[in-house]
């Protein structure tokens, strides 16, 4: 049995049907509404509404469109909540991975502080070696103060140039992030728990919205909500 979907056609009709084509915007399907022997299409709705007065037909269309929009808004809210949960769960997983990697890095970094630039006193041997090196500073003033210093570049790996971490200060990005309440693991877990409770609430609302559409479609044309709407207007 093909899955039936709610389809939106222009601004007038919305049908529950198994039809699916490229120029139709299919929405969330509801299996509980698709038990009829004949799929609900625009033609079927037209045939049914010919039994009603113009006012009854208009009331049915308005109630049907309203129920459809309400259902789709609840589905959209559910998707947004699920997306937020997924993002938070990914952030929590990345946090744990970053914290594990930073702990390993801190344990292996030597305690000696190394810097990218190293100062060396200017000597005659240093001057000779600098003049023969393509990466040296060869245009220094030879009449400069002999006590002055020059900067030499050494081939030191970049990761080893970082200063040793202070044992009393968190050195990793994850540790600094944990100090802020918004990105701490416990805060993310609390947010995830809250979002799951909202998901349960929205699912309950979706079930109620589906019941409204079920009443409009399966009990048509004697729908209780349709009869109430007919009596309350005009």
UniProtKB/Swiss-Prot annotation:
Its main location: cytoplasm. One of its GO terms (cellular component) is cytoplasm. Disulfide bonds: none annotated. It is found in: Cytoplasm; Nucleus. Residues 170-189 have a biased composition (Polar residues). Transmembrane segments: none annotated. This is Meiotically up-regulated gene 166 protein.
């Amino acid at each position: 049995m093909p899955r039936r979907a709610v389809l939106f056609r222009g601004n007038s009709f919305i049908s529950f049907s198994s039809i699916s084509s490229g120029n139709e915007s299919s929405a969330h399907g509801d299996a509980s509404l698709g038990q009829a022997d004949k799929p609900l299409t625009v033609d079927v709705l037209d045939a049914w509404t010919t039994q009603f007065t113009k006012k009854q037909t208009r009331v049915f269309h308005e109630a049907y469109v309203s129920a459809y929009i309400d259902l789709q808004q609840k589905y959209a809210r559910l998707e947004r909540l699920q997306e937020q949960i997924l993002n938070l769960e990914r952030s929590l997983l990345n946090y744990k991975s970053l914290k594990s990697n930073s702990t390993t890095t801190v344990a292996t970094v030597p305690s000696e502080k190394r810097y990218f630039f190293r100062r060396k006193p200017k000597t005659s041997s240093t001057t000779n070696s600098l003049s023969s090196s393509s990466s040296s500073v060869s245009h220094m003033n030879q009449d400069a103060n002999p006590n002055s210093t020059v900067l030499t570049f050494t081939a030191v790996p970049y990761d080893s140039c970082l200063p040793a971490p202070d044992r009393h200060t968190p050195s990793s990005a994850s540790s600094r992030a944990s100090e802020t309440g918004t990105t701490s693991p416990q805060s993310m877990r609390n947010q995830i728990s809250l979002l799951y409770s909202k998901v349960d609430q929205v699912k309950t609302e979706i079930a109620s919205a589906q019941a409204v559409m079920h009443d409009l479609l399966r009990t048509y044309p004697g729908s209780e909500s349709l009869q109430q709407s007919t009596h309350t207007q005009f």
